[in-house]
């Protein structure tokens, strides 16, 4: 990824506490959707144009489906072409 394509790069602390309100068997899935919606709302991008790194997904699923982390610190890279990448810092 050349540097000229990056329009914005920030590190965000993303709260995932809302996932605890869903059923125990859906908490990790809910955390992924909360992550997408949070980044979409803050950076004003469409949720279909958000790419989540597999390592971020592994971090959420690390302790299993029922116990996702309550918050994550992630690096968000917004590209000029309109897509947004979510990676670990």
From Swiss-Prot:
Keywords: Ribonucleoprotein, Ribosomal protein. GO terms for molecular function: structural constituent of ribosome. InterPro entries: Ribosomal_eL31, Ribosomal_eL31_CS, Ribosomal_eL31_dom_sf. The keyword Ribonucleoprotein applies. One of its GO terms (biological process) is translation. GO terms for cellular component: ribonucleoprotein complex; ribosome. Belongs to the eukaryotic ribosomal protein eL31 family. NCBIfam families: PRK01192.1-1. HAMAP family: Ribosomal_eL31. This is Large ribosomal subunit protein eL31. It comes from Thermoplasma volcanium (strain ATCC 51530 / DSM 4299 / JCM 9571 / NBRC 15438 / GSS1). The lineage of its organism: Archaea, Methanobacteriati, Thermoplasmatota, Thermoplasmata, Thermoplasmatales. The gene is rpl31e.
């Amino acid at each position: 990824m050349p540097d000229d394509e990056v329009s914005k790069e920030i590190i965000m602390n993303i709260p995932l506490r809302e996932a605890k309100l869903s059923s125990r068997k859906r908490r990790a899935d809910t955390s992924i959707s909360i992550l997408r919606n949070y980044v979409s709302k803050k950076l004003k991008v469409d949720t279909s144009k958000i790419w989540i790194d597999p390592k971020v997904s592994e971090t959420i699923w690390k302790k299993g489906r029922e116990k996702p982390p309550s918050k994550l610190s992630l690096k968000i890279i917004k590209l000029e072409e309109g897509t947004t990448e979510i990676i670990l810092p």
